[in-house]
Amino acid sequence: MAQVSMRDMLNAGVHYGHQTRYWNPKMKPFIFGARNGVHVINLEKTLPLFNEALAELTRISSNNGKVLFVGTKRAASEAVKAAAVDCQQFYVNHRWLGGMLTNWKTVRQSIKRLKDLEAQTQDGTFDKITKKEALMRTRELEKLELSLGGIKDMAGLPDAIFVIGADHEHIAIKEANNLGIPVFAIVDTNSTPDGINYIIPGNDDATRAIQLYLDAASAAVKEGRGSNVEAELQIPAE
């Protein structure tokens, strides 16, 4: 069972919040105190919440659920992509386009265009058009890949989103709320826990902390996917 320990979180600096003057009072239940003008997150609150979230991610994945990893801050971007790829799920790590979930029909058209352009790079189309046109299409492809590359094979809305940095990704959270998609999110002391189904109070800036969250979430998803495969193998042939 995918779990984290108190020692793991301490070593990764999960307990370091933001400066006290930037705090959101709604995070008070999860704050232990302050040290040198910086809030300290109560890891005795975080630990059970995080492990509960991991168990639910495993359950969702065991039912073939799709998990969308979201983290567009510079500190999280590459790690978000790596974690999603590692567990064969989906990601948005560059910029959240408004309507990415709530206007899925339009996003799907953009994904179709992305795949068409990818096909053109392989089937010789680019050799048959002018260099200027080929350059324009290449730039369009690069732009679409940056925005939509992580969801181009998602084939429908996700069953959950796992967010690094609730404050930074508030638009994604709001869209998920509007559609009833469960939200799992790392919530720092300057953020609001509103609209988050699975609150994980913790540092959302430190690279080591971000890596800890993503490694654990990816492991939980892989565990769920593995149990699903095992269940299928045990179904007797008719």
Curated annotation (Swiss-Prot):
GO biological process, one term: translation
Record keyword Ribosomal protein present: yes
One Gene Ontology CC term in the entry: cytosolic small ribosomal subunit
UniProt KW keywords: Ribonucleoprotein, Ribosomal protein
Organism domain of life: Bacteria
CDD domains for the chain: RPS2
UniProt-recorded Gene Ontology molecular function terms: structural constituent of ribosome
InterPro entries: Ribosomal_uS2, Ribosomal_uS2_bac/mit/plastid, Ribosomal_uS2_CS, Ribosomal_uS2_flav_dom_sf
Family: Belongs to the universal ribosomal protein uS2 family.
Name of the protein in its database record: Small ribosomal subunit protein uS2
Organism: Haemophilus ducreyi (strain 35000HP / ATCC 700724)
Organism placement in taxonomy: Bacteria, Pseudomonadati, Pseudomonadota, Gammaproteobacteria, Pasteurellales
